[in-house]
Amino acid sequence: DPAAIARHKDMKIVYTPIHGTGMMLIPRALKMWGFENVFTVPEQMVKDGNFPTVVSPNPENAEALSMAVNLAKEIDAELVMASDPDADRVGIACKDDKGEWVLINGNQTCMMYLYYILTQYKQLGKIKGNEFCVKTIVTTELIKKIADKNNIEMLDCYTGFKWIAREIRLREGKKKYIGGGEESYGFLAEDFVRDKDAVSACCLIAEVAAWAKDNGKSLYQLLLDIYVEYGFSKEFTVNVVKPGKSGAEEIKAMMENFRANPPKELGGSKVILSKDYKTLKQTDDKGNVTAIDMPEPSNVLQYFTEDGSKVSVRPSGTE
């Protein structure tokens, strides 16, 4: 929405590359996108692979955004964005309804991207019926709900943007890709890049914030609107670290135990569907087994419960 950007070109934005490559392109891209009040964190605009100002340069962590948030408080900014060292993921912070700075997680960011893109497509009359979007299997199901309600095809794929790129490639020239992302803070808005990209993602989230402001809302209020319209979702990740050879064996044993003794109940709610991506089979609570349509096996288990929860079990190296 170029008009919304033009009306709010003075919106104060704080950006940090956390000593990484984003410093070369993202501030420039935001200005080219129409935003004239982009502030950077001086101490973190220094290229340094030791990342001296943070414990870890991971934009998923509040600590990595703390200097940017402090600057935002000083200048009364409306949006904070931080890209990871190779500038393919972006972490976001904004003020909540009480004026406190809060982090927006990867699932929430994906929801806002998709909600905005679909809203714009509808307003501009660009929906042709051949659009599709993609999410990874561990990303919130609320994104599918948004797509379904808007009659947009939603595809599931494995974790990693090579799988999203694969879905784009398979439909090239036949269908229109309008967005894809994963819960680990990656999003791809257009198909000219075939990997997660913080440059376009930063421009897009700034545009979403300007559009929300144009409608008398903050980014946080927009998120609440999505929850009111489509339902609430909450996500959390538990990392169980098992280092070394013994750890790898323990992880293997844990996965084998899950397969041999699948849970009947999780969090007090009955498991109604179990998916095993290693065997590419899914089993419902009545014992019916059907195939899962995925390109290859993967060592991931998922359990869907009666109360609408989804639990994913996925080994990754030492975790």
Stretches with model-predicted labels:
Residues 73, 77-79, 100-102, 120-315:
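Phosphate-binding and adjacent anionic-ligand microenvironments
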Residues 20-24, 87-91, 164, 187:
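Short glycine/serine/threonine-rich phosphate/pyrophosphate-binding segments
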Residues 36-40, 100-118, 200-204:
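Gly/Ser/Thr-rich active-site loops/lids in small-molecule metabolic enzymes
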Residues 31-91:
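N-terminal small/polar loop signature for handling phosphorylated ligands or for N-terminal nucleophile
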Residues 1-33, 37-50:
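Gly/Ser-rich phosphate-binding catalytic loop and adjacent alpha/beta segment
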Residues 1, 12, 18-27, 69, ...:
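Domain-scale recognition of functional cores that engage charged ligands
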Residues 88-106, 143:
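Short Gly/Thr/Asp-enriched flexible loops that form oxyanion-binding sites at enzyme active sites
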